Amino acid sequence: LNRDEIGDRAPSAVAVMPTAAIEQHGPHNPVGLDTMCCMAVARGAAEAAGEVDVIVSPPLHFGSSDHHRPFPGVLSLRSGTFSQVLYEVVESLALSGFRRILILNGHGGNILLIQQVARDFVLANPDARVAAAAYWDIARPRLEAVEAARPVNVPGHGGDFETALMLHLDSELVRSDLVPVKDADRDDPRT
């Protein structure tokens, strides 16, 4: 979209701002898994929104992942930096004319931070409607309906749920030969 298209649509559209992380998800999944899954869900939701105009913004790839820093490939922001960057992106969306903004989370470590940013922004901008949610929480009722949402596996971390999503999105990026075979290892963030 160009600036004029965004300007025309923003006042009546919902902006979806995907947030994620670049971090390890076991030896078998790519480090960009959180971003790829969150973007796919955001785009799918936008397509399925019917008459509701949904514009998906570019994602905030980098999350707060200090607990994964011992692993190679992790690109993490300190929680204060992440929150400040996200606040300013939400502010930019509002300045572009969006009145309704959903911060869509794709990384467990961001949950409390995105909720706080949404609260802080609404307190400072009472006319704004900003919500924050993880994609797996939004999808949980449908996942439970097909018995895919046991408490231990959604979203998990590099476990069955996330690996299945990656296999669906781009199976070439999943190293099937490196998938842990013991159930206990599948959702362990240390693997």
Regions inferred by a protein language model and the residue ranges of each:
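Extended, histidine- and acidic-residue-enriched regions that form the cofactor-binding/catalytic faces
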Residues: 1-102, 108-191
